[in-house]
């Protein structure tokens, strides 16, 4: 009884909003330590207690363990400035992901063939290879760097057995010169193509080149390949590029760097619909695979119909400029879902939605009903049903927006883990309140202080279903960490309560913004000007910022006398809240402000 009272007394210290926020992060696969740090709790013990009391673990158990691992891999992959511990955790998760898939294959083989029974005696973490009898002999010999001479096709069979139907179908169409695959999120495409390339490099000696939208995604390819080589073949791969003992090279390149066109080999282009300079990417990828023997494989979730990649997917770039091709029909979307088709331009196209993945055997990995509840129909269709965004009426250009995404590791004056992340440099805050139960957003913008600098979004925060008091306290904590000279708050409606509370501790910085057609137009034009002239940057890992901007459209008011800007409201883009939070921060900027140019000085020699 005493213990019960003690627990109750401890719980009462925290508002329901704090517990709700902890639950939200818990289900996103944050660790108790990370949740405590995120919410400013003194201890992680309440997290363990709440998880047990409110059965949060049961909610997680409804999802497959592989799905949970995949979610955590995504969370860590997108995290900037990862600590050594987080890097080790990411590598361990990839290791575990491969082991689970291998165990699943072994289970299937055990049921379907008695010959697989022998593998049941081996631990899932230390499973023997097909030729394990030679293992001790190999250890006695001097190891050759990246030696794959002992690998046989039979050793690949456990992996092949673990594939889902749609992955096997992609594998059976490996012979096509160009494969173009539009896919749902989290269906194991990176995982599969990593092994396909490794297998091909081992047995053919051909070079393999991975082109990814970011350095972090390229690292995922490499990590998968290193772990697979160790797990399936007992080989420790090192180097960048990785050069196998048979001479095959595996290159891992990001498109935000100066990619060398001197490399040649089979090309894998990852998430091509989100690459900022797609035309350059296409030129480089094609140049690397110019030789007749090289294959090209492109796969991505869809982005915008106005992104250059859409014409690559639709075949419009093949039709362009040739009257004879103008009316050549391409397979329908339904046909591409139905096993894929070889198209008139020579590309084999294939669509794998989450529904197709479930039918193909991945039903244990996903709970599609939970995903439909989590996302709006608009967001669900884009992320999981392979539907391109139609942003014809948007005031923003998707190509310009993608250029704003950068690798923030280059910002040497910003350390998000420090007590004072930006030192004493001036920053501006912007707050967009929650609407109808959706999330509130807060962003921190660093205005340029030196010639050549741009506006930078240092950080963003989203708070779901929380009270004014909680949100104001979160802003207070950030206010104490940064030299925040301005906090723009949408005080038109529900945000007024937050403004009143923030004003108590930041009277000079807090600024109430009353939304009307004139004020909204001014703020939107300021942000539009920054994007158009490439004067604003944010982390390239913040993938939902671009869709948030693309939702902003120009239309007349109900009276028809005034033009204003509106956003199509969806759950995934949080009512375009990150866009309006940025607007509220940039409101501090004058429309007439121009970027400070770098001055060039020279000394005249009068002699």
Curated annotation (Swiss-Prot):
For this protein, the record's Pfam families field holds:
Terminase_5, Terminase_6C, Terminase_6N
Keyword ATP-binding attributed: yes
Cross-referenced InterPro entries, in alphabetical order?
A: ATPase_terminase-su_N, P-loop_NTPase, Terminase_6C
User: Which keywords label this protein?
Assistant: ATP-binding, Nucleotide-binding, Viral genome packaging, Viral release from host cell
Q: Name one GO molecular function term.
A: ATP binding
Q: Which family does it belong to?
A: To phage P2 protein P.
Its recorded name reads Probable terminase, ATPase subunit
